């Protein structure tokens, strides 16, 4: 599939503290956060003018699902626009709290674990063709996804009985199955619940829930871009070496606990391979595939260059080569500098604080944004495009139809209901348009519905 629909869903951790002590329960904070949303949307589950969905997920986690995007750079921009929307809700919630005489700071963290050991996710969505064996797709993808954390892990200081260790991935400790239809109970690598949000005869939605949430724009680009290339190879019938893992769940933890990428994991064939070797296999196949097919877009070249350089840097133990582009490396360098300066062990509470503060989405507080201000975080988006993405949907996908419909209905103060595929006016006629093609950004039926308001 040369043109693919992508979507990202990020759940955010939330807390409110006063002088270091927890001030409100997550439920109470979430209520303040969403008060503005509920006042205009009459619900804590709404679709926005940019085509995205914003809602309160299980366990009081705000969740932002990007609109459908058909290129990876635009997807990263819309994910960042979601961060900005939530930052706006955070500032508004703090103001309301202070007006009511409740002192405290509200924090939203774009991470995947809280201090109690709970995990919440970043879910990636890739549209794939319905024909073809899904099990074959999953079999080839799983070794890639288990080792992909070397490219796009968010990094985590993990407290163990033997002391604290720095791990590549936050999510790795919380994955318990390879492929399953559950998302919370057993947490698989690939979720098989079949909800295509499109024509079910033609498409299915590959739902990957193993990845970490990313602060870095370049890490996000690499995560989705490399996965897209692997999918393209599978779809084209590229012959791949059998890298099936003997035990993917054990392997994902072993890979996460080794920042050198050299620890061997057992394959089902009885052989052993390191995460670097597995990734190198996929990377070299992808380079060859793109050369043979003449795939030469700027994004693909960017993805391949960063993919190769990341593997080279880890192999050479020269992390400075990717020190402004890969989340787990950026955070690791930040922690190591701080530890060296203050002569601290990895178990020190201040180190845990840095680990968390990296993911604070408040641009005046978060450590990732401090690095960005210092020019120590490479960017691929610009702030104007991100600002635009808060209210303007992607113009080349179904999101445009949804966004335009919502904008017009709100301007005309009309009651409406939307989801990923339906647009409905709640009037006497109950006019509804079903939009099954996510690639379609122009539709006479929708134009008519909008014109009739």
UniProtKB/Swiss-Prot annotation:
Catalytic class of the enzyme: ligase
GO biological processes: modification-dependent protein catabolic process; proteasomal protein catabolic process; protein pupylation
Pathway in which the depicted protein is active: Protein degradation; proteasomal Pup-dependent pathway; Protein modification; protein pupylation
The keyword Ligase belongs to this UniProt entry's keyword annotation: yes
Segments crossing the lipid bilayer: none
EC number(s) reported in the record: 6.3.1.19
Residues where Mg(2+) binds: 9, 55, 63
Alphabetical keyword list: ATP-binding, Ligase, Magnesium, Metal-binding, Nucleotide-binding, Ubl conjugation pathway
A Pfam family hit: Pup_ligase
Record's catalysed reaction(s): ATP + [prokaryotic ubiquitin-like protein]-L-glutamate + [protein]-L-lysine = ADP + phosphate + N(6)-([prokaryotic ubiquitin-like protein]-gamma-L-glutamyl)-[protein]-L-lysine
Molecular-function GO term, any one: ubiquitin-like protein transferase activity
Active site: 57
Binding site for ATP: 53, 66, 420
Record's keyword annotation contains Acetylation: no
Similarity comment text for this entry: Belongs to the Pup ligase/Pup deamidase family. Pup-conjugating enzyme subfamily.
Other known facts: The reaction mechanism probably proceeds via the activation of Pup by phosphorylation of its C-terminal glutamate, which is then subject to nucleophilic attack by the substrate lysine, resulting in an isopeptide bond and the release of phosphate as a good leaving group.
UniProt function note: Catalyzes the covalent attachment of the prokaryotic ubiquitin-like protein modifier Pup to the proteasomal substrate proteins, thereby targeting them for proteasomal degradation. This tagging system is termed pupylation. The ligation reaction involves the side-chain carboxylate of the C-terminal glutamate of Pup and the side-chain amino group of a substrate lysine.
Protein name in the entry: Pup--protein ligase
Organism of derivation: Streptomyces avermitilis (strain ATCC 31267 / DSM 46492 / JCM 5070 / NBRC 14893 / NCIMB 12804 / NRRL 8165 / MA-4680)
The organism's taxonomic lineage, starting at the top: Bacteria, Bacillati, Actinomycetota, Actinomycetes, Kitasatosporales
């Amino acid at each position: 599939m040369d043109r693919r629909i992508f979507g990202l869903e990020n759940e955010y951790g939330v807390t409110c503290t006063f002088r270091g002590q927890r001030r409100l329960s997550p439920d109470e904070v979430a209520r303040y956060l969403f008060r503005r949303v509920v006042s205009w949307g009459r619900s804590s589950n709404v679709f926005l003018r940019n085509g995205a969905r914003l809602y309160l997920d299980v366990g009081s986690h705000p969740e932002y699902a990007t609109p459908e995007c058909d290129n990876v750079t635009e997807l990263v921009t819309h994910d960042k626009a979601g961060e900005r929307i939530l930052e706006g809700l955070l500032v508004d919630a703090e103001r309301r709290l202070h007006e009511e005489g409740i002192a405290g700071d509200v924090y939203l963290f774009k991470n995947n674990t809280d201090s109690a050991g709970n995990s919440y996710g970043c879910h990636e969505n890739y549209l794939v063709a319905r024909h073809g064996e899904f099990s074959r797709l999953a079999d080839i993808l799983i070794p890639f996804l288990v080792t992909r954390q070397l490219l796009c892990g968010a990094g985590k200081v993990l407290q163990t009985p033997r002391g604290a260790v720095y791990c590549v991935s936050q999510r790795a400790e919380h994955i318990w199955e390879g492929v399953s239809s559950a998302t919370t109970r057993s947490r698989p690598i690939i979720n098989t619940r079949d909800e295509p949000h499109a024509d079910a005869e033609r498409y299915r939605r590959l739902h990957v829930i193993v990845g970490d949430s990313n602060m870095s724009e370049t890490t996000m680009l690499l995560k989705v871009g490399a996965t897209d290339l692997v999918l393209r190879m599978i779809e084209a019938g590229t012959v791949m070496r059998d890298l099936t893992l003997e035990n993917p769940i054990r392997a994902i933890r072993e890979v996460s606990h080794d920042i050198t990428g050299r620890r061997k994991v057992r394959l089902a064939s009885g052989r052993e391979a390191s995460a670097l070797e597995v990734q190198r296999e996929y990377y070299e196949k992808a380079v060859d595939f793109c050369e043979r097919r003449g795939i030469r877009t700027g994004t693909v070249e960017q993805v391949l260059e960063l993919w190769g350089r990341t593997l080279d840097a880890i192999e050479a133990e020269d992390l400075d080569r990717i020190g402004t582009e890969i989340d787990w490396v950026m955070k690791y360098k930040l922690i190591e500098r701080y530890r060296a300066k203050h002569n601290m062990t990895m178990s020190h509470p201040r180190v845990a604080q840095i680990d968390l503060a990296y993911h604070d989405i408040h641009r005046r507080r978060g450590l990732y944004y401090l690095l960005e201000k210092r020019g120590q975080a490479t960017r691929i988006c610009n702030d104007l495009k991100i600002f635009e993405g808060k209210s303007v949907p992607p113009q080349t996908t179904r999101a445009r139809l949804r966004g335009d419909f919502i904008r017009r209905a709100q301007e005309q103060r009309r009651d409406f209901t939307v989801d990923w595929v339906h647009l409905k006016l709640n009037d006497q006629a109950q006019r509804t348009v079903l939009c099954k093609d996510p690639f379609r950004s122009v539709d006479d039926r929708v134009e008519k519905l909008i014109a009739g308001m």
